[in-house]
């Protein structure tokens, strides 16, 4: 076991504060900065695995700029020390490789930054924190996550779950990377024992789920977390990607993509004015749900030209499998049918078992039907079932424990089958992937701040999923407390925002609405300067109002435009109730 020499580290500290990047970015300096084995419980460092090299001509796109507009889109040269370290878990014989990027000493602002990944991939880029003067890291999670996605390694073989990879992907790898990274950062820059290292997390989609896993399980490590559209409630969320296909097979109708698009666009047009301004954005999907009947669209004409489209094949979209795919759609000309509207209504209504008990929530009205898009069969000249691989692969690998990339058929699959799959996965992965622990006392008590947001028209992860978790936290942490007091106390450390018209972790091509672009600036101001947000700063990037700044309403207040330039944040109890769900199809609480 290595011995940690305080005198040597103190000397390194003084040198690091005054030295250039070239002076501190050496293998010996990094090895001296490693915590001694036994200091971090369950982590034994491998000093011989350390690498270090100074990087001067690399640019950073900045934080999570490519995932939902967070962190900006700057492309600036940030010199940094590119470090690789490795560790093992005592008794396991494994090896976890972690990359860290340390800004040159003159740029360091006593910050550590963690970026989330997406789909079944953890982030492999360690440079996201550079623009904030933050050290940052990325981990291979012990299963070479730099080269393989988690779904590729979840099974050793049929019937045999790789639990080590599962727990590492679920939360452990990022928690260990941050625990080690904060200690290493402190020593690398020679900070005094009482010096603060502000630690931030930022991510969307599964990156949002990963962030929630850190807040739930490593709350005292983080000062601020920004989580967008979290893919938590994993069992329900992933199986829900098969729900739209089961609706179509149950109703025996596969709407042409153009018919589905017409239903969405006509709904947007009809509900746009309900929020008080006609701008192409439905800021109040709750009012749309309460006051608009999709049946009014029956008989409306639609037309779409023939097209060939390509999917990149990543993330939690319809096509999860790696590798791009190409599909052909013929020209489509027709009118919206009652069968098409029936499919749309059933999807928006959400999954119920055959006893009529609700099992899960669904996408907000005006969301695209991403999981419902059928395939064109040239041989039969008809639209046919296309099972989304995001949901299908989860069922085969995570529920059935078969090493298959998708379901081959939905024969004999009913709504009850979906509920059974959800229940099986919920029980199996409750302490790993589910990520729904509602007691955030540790995070709150440590002074942590949570900024949680979700695109209201997200077609992948329902916006109501985030609303449900927010309400779960409120009810668990403030039992017996009045509504006004619990809300006031909660908003001091946990704020949730719905983004009008927004899609999954980004702006929506169908609705030219606002989107947040400087969440990290807001979070840093909140954490380091005590400036608590009241509303969320967003910018409209397209359409007639491009460039407009909108300060969004904090949940549970809802926007209502007074005129074309000003909106109020109002309390609308009936609308808020439309976002509330219980799930009696399950016999245990679903947070």
Task: List where the protein language model places each region.
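Histidine-bearing beta->alpha loop at or near hydrolase active sites
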Residues: 485, 490-510, 542-545
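Active-site rim elements
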Residues: 167-170, 254-258, 329-332, 456-457, ...
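Fungal secretory targeting signals
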Residues: 1-21
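Serine-hydrolase-like catalytic core of hydrolytic proteins
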Residues: 3, 80, 84-277, 289-293, ...
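Acidic, glycine-anchored loop motifs typical of Ca2+
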Residues: 276-284, 301, 306
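Catalytic-loop region of hydrolases
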Residues: 14-111, 123-124, 291-405, 516, ...
């Amino acid at each position: 076991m290595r011995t940690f020499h305080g005198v040597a580290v103190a000397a390194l500290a003084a040198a690091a504060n005054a030295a250039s990047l070239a002076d501190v970015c050496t293998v010996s300096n990094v090895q001296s900065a490693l915590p001694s084995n036994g200091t971090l419980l369950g982590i034994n460092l491998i000093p011989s695995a350390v690498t270090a090299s100074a990087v001067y001509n690399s640019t950073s796109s900045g934080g999570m700029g490519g995932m939902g507009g967070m962190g900006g889109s700057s492309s600036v040269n940030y010199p940094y020390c590119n470090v690789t370290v490795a560790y093992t878990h005592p008794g396991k014989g494994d090896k976890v490789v972690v990359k860290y990027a340390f800004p040159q000493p003159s740029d360091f602002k006593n910050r550590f930054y963690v970026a989330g990944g997406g789909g079944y991939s953890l982030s492999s880029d360690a440079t996201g924190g550079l623009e904030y003067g933050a050290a940052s890291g990325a981990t291979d999670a012990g299963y070479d996550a730099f080269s393989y996605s988690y779904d590729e390694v979840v099974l050793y073989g049929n019937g045999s779950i790789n639990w080590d990879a599962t727990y590492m992907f679920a939360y452990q790898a990022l928690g260990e990377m941050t625990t080690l990274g904060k200690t290493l950062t402190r020593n690398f820059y020679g900070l005094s024992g009482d010096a603060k290292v502000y630690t931030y997390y930022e991510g969307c989609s599964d990156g949002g789920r990963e962030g929630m896993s850190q807040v739930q399980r490593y709350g005292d490590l983080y000062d601020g977390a920004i989580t967008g559209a979290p893919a938590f409630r994993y069992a329900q969320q992933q199986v829900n990607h098969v729900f739209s296909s089961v609706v179509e097979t149950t109703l025996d109708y596969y709407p042409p993509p153009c018919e589905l698009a017409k239903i969405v666009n006509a709904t947007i047009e009809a509900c746009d004015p309900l929020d008080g301004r006609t701008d192409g954005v439905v800021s109040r999907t709750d009012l749309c749900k309460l006051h608009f009947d999709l049946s009014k669209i029956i008989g409306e004409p639609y037309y779409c030209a023939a097209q060939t489209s390509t999917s990149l094949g990543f993330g939690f979209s319809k096509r999860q499998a790696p590798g791009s795919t190409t599909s052909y759609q013929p020209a489509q000309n027709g009118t919206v049918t009652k069968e098409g509207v029936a499919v749309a209504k059933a999807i928006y209504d959400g999954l119920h078992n055959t006893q009529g008990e609700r099992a899960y929530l669904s996408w907000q009205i005006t969301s695209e039907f991403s999981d419902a898009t059928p395939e064109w069969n040239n041989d039969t000249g008809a639209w046919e079932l296309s099972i989304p691989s995001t949901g299908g692969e989860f069922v085969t690998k995570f529920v059935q424990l078969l090493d298959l990339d998708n379901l081959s058929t939905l024969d004999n699959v009913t709504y009850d089958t979906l509920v059974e799959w959800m229940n099986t996965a919920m029980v199996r992965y409750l302490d790993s992937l589910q990520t729904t622990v509602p007691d955030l006392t540790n995070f709150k008590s440590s002074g942590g701040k949570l900024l949680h947001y979700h695109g209201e028209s997200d077609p992948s992860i329902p916006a109501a999923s985030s609303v449900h978790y927010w309400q779960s936290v409120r009810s668990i942490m403030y039992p017996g407390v009045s509504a006004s007091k619990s809300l006031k106390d909660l908003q001091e450390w946990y704020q949730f925002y719905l983004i009008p018209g927004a899609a999954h972790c980004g702006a929506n091509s169908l609705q030219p609405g606002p989107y947040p672009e400087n969440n990290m600036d807001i979070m840093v101001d909140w954490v380091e300067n005590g400036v608590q947000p009241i509303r969320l700063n967003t910018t409209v990037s397209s359409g007639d109002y491009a460039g407009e700044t909108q300060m969004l309403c904090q949940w549970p207040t809802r926007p209502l435009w007074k005129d074309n330039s000003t909106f109020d944040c109002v309390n609308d109890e009936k609308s808020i109730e439309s976002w509330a769900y219980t799930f009696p199809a399950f016999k245990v609480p679903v947070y």
